[in-house]
Amino acid sequence: AVPPDMDGKSLLKLVQGQESEWRKYLDMEHATCYSQDNYWCALTDGKIKYVWNFHTGKEELFDLRKDPNELVECSGKPAYATQLKEMRQAMVDHLAERDETFVKDGKLVVRETTMLYSPNYPQTK
């Protein structure tokens, strides 16, 4: 058991393949610390990966089951329209907790500014 004063959750059920209340998506983000053009956020459930490019609004969708190396971008393919819509909504839900510079009126917002570091990064405090 996880001690009550320890932050986090036990991964035991997850690694044993048992039913577990765990988040549905893994979040990935890239800031502009290396390149001004490389500012995005992505969500994946391990089967599908959705990428939202903050500065351009470009969406990318990859079918990781068929294309684990992400060589075929599927956002414009009619066969993936439902998955694109679902993943876009998941990103809206994910980013909505931040502020209106990320999501406004239920839609993703193209950002003109960037953050080089997380708000919790020691240099920003």
Regions found by a protein language model. Name each.
Residues 1-60, 64, 82, 98, ...:
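C-terminal cap/loop subdomain of S1 sulfatases and analogous C-terminal strand-loop tails that border
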Residues 13, 73-76:
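Phosphate-coordinating loops and pocket residues in cytosolic domains that bind phosphorylated ligands
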Residues 67:
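Intrinsically disordered, low-complexity polar regions and short flexible loop motifs
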Residues 77-81:
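Short, conserved loop/turn and helix-capping segments at secondary-structure boundaries
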Residues 90-99:
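A short, conserved beta-to-alpha structural element at the edge of catalytic cores
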Residues 123-125:
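Basic/polar N-terminal segments that are highly enriched at the extreme N-terminus
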